[in-house]
Swiss-Prot record:
It comes from Triticum aestivum (Wheat). Keywords: Stress response. Pfam families: LEA_5. PANTHER family: EM-LIKE PROTEIN GEA1, EMBRYONIC ABUNDANT PROTEIN 1. Residues 1-93 are annotated as: Disordered. Induction: By abscisic acid (ABA) and osmotic stress. Belongs to the small hydrophilic plant seed protein family. It comes from the Eukaryota. It is thought to provide protection for the cytoplasm during the desiccation stage of embryo development. This is Em protein H5. One of its GO terms (biological process) is response to abscisic acid. Wheat contains at least 10 different genes for Em protein. The gene is EMH5.
Length: 93
């Protein structure tokens, strides 16, 4: 059990030095903070998926995947003639 604690201490030290040690924990200043950030981000995505439904969530991902630093996904889709069905984005009542 002590090795588990040592490992957590090492990960915490790395996190305090600015390294991301938990997937999805970017921006956390400690191991615990990164764990909380990752958990919240995951839960937020699941909630959004429930609100939009599988199809809407997938369509929104397509649009987001088209975005670049220079233009939004919507701008790029319009420019390249890619059809994005935004009616699928509506939340389920």
């Amino acid at each position: 059990m002590a090795s588990g604690q040592q490992e957590r201490s090492e990960l915490d030290r790395m996190a305090r030095e600015g390294e991301t040690v938990v997937p999805g924990g970017t921006g956390g200043k400690s191991l615990e903070a990164q764990e909380h950030l990752a958990d919240g981000r995951s839960r937020g995505g699941e909630t959004r998926k429930e609100q939009l439904g599988e199809e809407g969530y997938r369509e929104m991902g397509r649009k987001g995947g088209l975005s670049t630093m220079e233009e939004s996904g919507g701008e790029r889709a319009a420019r390249e003639g890619i059809e994005i069905d935004e009616s699928k984005f509506k939340t389920k009542s």
